[in-house]
Amino acid sequence: MKRICKLILVCTIATFIFTLPLGHAQENTAGKILILCYSRTGNTKLTCEALQKALNAQMIEIKDLTDRSGAWGGLTGMLNTLFNMQTSIEPEHPDIASCPNIILASPLWAGKLAPAIRTVIARNTFDKNKVIIFTTGNAILDELNQEKNKAPVIASGGKVVGYFQVAVQEKVNDKKVDRPKEKVIEDTLKLVPEINKAFSSQP
């Protein structure tokens, strides 16, 4: 009986020890994360809404004032991206001073951040923020291209503490098809512990 009681006590203490760091990390970041999200087709917004709820974060949707709808809108957006051009956005200067932790969320266009998010980075200073870049795309970027997307944030003074990405398409019978939304959300939510850890572990 004593042995059983000791075993229960040890298990209880172990559970407390191993769950404390994660709980402490969530407590430290709760309400202190701002998601700046741009979404053209709705995929990035879908993932950001899931992150907002899971992280207890604030969210501001960045609007590209240039019409990006339809094939023509997609083409002009791609050209803007290839030539690193900025665009008109709203809000141009979101309040990033009130949140120390920023998530910049963007679809990938030609492996780069969308013009609206690149414009946010160019027109704001992130020297008082820890920044995570979160991207959605048809494929997963390699480390070299991740570093290229981090570079403008670093140039603006931000400390990039993480880069996370979720694929919104998959190959089926040699053809790219949209992944089920529930799978996209599931993959997004799997990132939450690592996002909390990234914001909490960096000085």
Tell me the role of every PLM-derived stretch:
Residues 1-10:
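Bacterial N-terminal signal peptides that target proteins for export
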Residues 62-74:
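Acidic helix-start/capping segments at beta-turn-to-alpha-helix junctions
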Residues 12-15, 19-34, 38-64, 78, ...:
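FMN-binding flavodoxin-like domain, especially the glycine-rich phosphate-binding loop
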